[in-house]
Swiss-Prot record:
The protein's name: Probable head completion protein 2
Recorded GO CC terms: virion component
One example of a Gene Ontology biological process annotation: symbiont genome ejection through host cell envelope, long flexible tail mechanism
Species in which this protein is naturally found: Lactococcus phage SK1 (Lactococcus lactis bacteriophage SK1)
Recorded family membership: Belongs to the skunalikevirus head completion protein 2 family.
Keywords: Viral capsid assembly, Viral genome ejection through host cell envelope, Viral long flexible tail ejection system, Viral penetration into host cytoplasm, Viral release from host cell, Virion, Virus entry into host cell
Domain of life: Viruses
Function: Probably functions as a stopper that is part of the head-tail connector and that locks the viral DNA in the capsid. During assembly, functions as a docking platform which the preassembled tail can bind to. Plays a role in morphogenesis of the virion capsid after genome packaging.
Cellular compartment(s): Virion
Length: 56
């Protein structure tokens, strides 16, 4: 999937039936979980919600 902005990506992520979002690496991969690996990061805040977004 491609998104035009971080807001579009975040809003789409909220609609997915996910159990968890993992920033980093785990030994096992679980169903309905998003795993994100970040090389560098920046905290982005909006509407009383904040999350970390990575840049390559």
């Amino acid at each position: 999937m491609e998104f035009d902005s971080y807001i579009d990506w975040y809003n789409n992520l909220l609609t997915m039936p996910l159990n968890d979002v993992i920033l980093g690496v785990k030994d096992t991969i679980e169903d309905k979980t998003v795993y994100l690996s970040l090389s560098d990061s920046k905290v982005i805040k909006m509407d009383n919600t904040s999350f970390v977004m990575g840049y390559y």
